Regions:
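Single conserved hydrophobic/aromatic residue that forms the stacking wall/gate
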Residues: 274-286
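Accessory carbohydrate-recognition regions in carbohydrate-active enzymes
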Residues: 1-273, 277
């Protein structure tokens, strides 16, 4: 909490509080075509210009004069960036090191790729696939392996990154619809279509708020101060982060999951830490 710089807004499916991250990638709005490396693209921010709720996050990135917002679903999210007037507005997609790929598809305003980064204990075929679809055509793009810029639409190697650019008016908003899958790129796209589709940012935000209000509203407390209420519900929110859904819904509407034990795609549900934190939960698991 003491940090005052942001290098990226990270998508994560952290498997537990003690295993660190798992197949993560980051998305960072920037102003300037040379601001790709994490040190170059980082921006100062203040917690006074930040809003953090279970269903919504917003922050003003001072170095880029950009407001970044996020609203989640189970396996997807919608990000909205409010840019200044610039012909060098952009978004950097960082698939991180230890083996990754990015591919830019300008005709569909889409970036896809995969990440293999993890903290150990995964099968050899472990990958987190992602798809990012923008609502504005690209004015340009670049792809990198580490600090080496590559020709073409794709980068695959130790550390793949992509940057896409836009010409924006002051106050213009660019929306990115994002989803991921541990199964395949096709499944990531299916997750995006199923959970977000054409819904706009405010719709996804409202849906997320409704779901979190239902969860946190299951317990009502009284007799405390506002600060005590805030502490209680903050802790209640954190307690609901695990167990989490590790399964996805296939084209036939059936639950399937990537097994972190043998690397196979198996039928049925899987929920991380379910036996430890909720041993009597009735939902079927495999």
């Amino acid at each position: 909490y003491g940090s005052h710089t942001i290098r990226g807004l990270k998508q994560t499916h952290q498997p537990s509080p003690w295993i660190n991250d798992y197949g993560q990638f980051s998305i960072m709005p920037v102003r300037g075509k040379e601001k790709v490396d994490e040190n170059a693209r980082q921006s100062w921010f203040s917690h006074q210009s930040e809003t953090a709720k279970p269903y919504y996050y917003s922050v003003y990135l001072a170095d880029h004069d950009v407001v970044a917002e996020m609203a989640p679903t189970d396996r997807a999210a919608v990000l909205r960036f409010t840019f200044p007037e610039s012909d060098e507005s952009g978004v950097v997609i960082d698939a991180f090191d230890r083996g990754s790929q990015v591919k830019v598809m300008p005709d569909s305003r889409t970036v896809v790729g995969y990440i293999t980064r993890n903290s150990g204990g995964v099968p050899d075929n472990f990958r987190n696939w992602f798809v990012i679809r923008f609502d504005k055509p690209f004015s340009g793009f670049r792809v990198f392996n580490g600090k080496n810029e590559l020709k073409g639409f794709e980068a695959e190697g130790e550390h793949a990154l992509a940057a896409v650019y836009f010409t924006t008016r002051r106050g213009e908003q660019v929306t990115a619809r994002v989803a991921s899958s541990f199964i395949s790129e096709e499944q990531a796209l299916r997750n995006l279509e199923t959970e977000v589709g054409d819904a706009d940012f405010e719709t996804v935000k409202a849906r997320a708020q409704e779901r979190w209000d239902e969860v946190l509203g299951r317990i009502e407390v009284s007799g405390g101060t506002e600060e005590q209420y805030r502490t209680f519900y903050s802790c209640l929110y954190r307690s609901t982060l695990f167990p989490r859904k590790f399964y996805e819904i296939d084209a036939k509407g059936n639950p399937v999951h990537y097994s972190p034990y043998n690397g196979e795609v198996l039928p049925g549900y899987m929920l991380s830490l379910i036996h430890i934190s909720e041993p009597t939960r009735p939902e079927p698991i495999s």
